[in-house]
A protein has these predicted regions:
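ATP-dependent carboxylate/acyl-activation modules
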Residues: 19-211
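Internal, active-site/partner-interface "lid" segment
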Residues: 1-30
Length: 211
């Protein structure tokens, strides 16, 4: 009577569960309708989001968030996580990267310093604060064309002013837990890595070049 090795049995078990899990996922996807976005990365592509955005933020104003907006919002929130307990801090992002970042004694100064880093790239960018946005700061923000403004809270008058731009997306961020692992599709499979939770401190920096 033929027998199979432990290695072979593990292989067949893996294949069997792979098939059954795809069936279960197909049922889940049918009932868990995805949010259709305006378009994907480019206007000729379709795009969807599968998840619960309401756990992350409340949208207070503006048009529907786009595929690219969501990528930038994710990058902004992940960046600011390291500075939740810091002095007033402001960041400006474009294409998933920070083009301006600053911490100061008050939020207006933090915003202006972040903007000064690269005012050209800031145009049409994503703005995020680690504290409530006040009227003074909102008045400065309102002179810049930006896609999204994110903060844990907004002063009432500041919010009214920021809403004066019809399409500007205003998001009130919630205190949300994010998984320690990040997944992304790759070669018909999934890559998984631990989230980068290490914060570099300026005192550990070493000067390698002198101009």
């Amino acid at each position: 009577m033929a027998s199979t090795s432990l290695k072979e049995r593990k292989y067949f078990a893996t294949e069997s569960f792979s098939v059954s899990s795809k069936y279960d996922k197909a049922i889940f996807d049918y009932f868990n309708k995805k949010n259709e976005l305006r378009y994907g990365e480019n206007p000729h592509q379709k795009g969807w989001f599968s998840g619960d955005l309401e756990k992350v933020f409340s949208q207070l104003h503006g048009k529907q968030v786009s595929y690219n907006n969501l990528l930038d919002i994710d990058a902004a929130i992940m960046l600011m996580q390291d500075f939740e307990s810091s002095p007033p801090t402001f960041a400006i992002l474009k294409h998933n990267n920070a083009c301006g970042f600053a911490s100061r004694s008050n939020l207006k100064e933090a915003y202006l310093a972040a903007l000064e880093a690269d005012p050209v790239s800031a145009f049409g960018g994503i703005l995020i604060s680690n504290i409530e946005i006040d009227l003074e700061t909102a008045s400065e923000i309102n002179t810049l064309f930006c896609e999204v403004v994110i903060a844990p809270a907004f002063d009432k008058k500041a919010l009214e002013l920021l809403k004066s731009k019809k399409n500007r997306i205003i998001l009130k961020q919630k205190n949300t837990y994010f998984p320690e692992k990040i997944e992304r599709s790759c070669l018909n499979g999934i890559l998984i890595k631990q989230r980068d939770l290490r914060t570099e401190e300026i005192k550990t920096f070493e000067l390698k070049t002198v101009s």
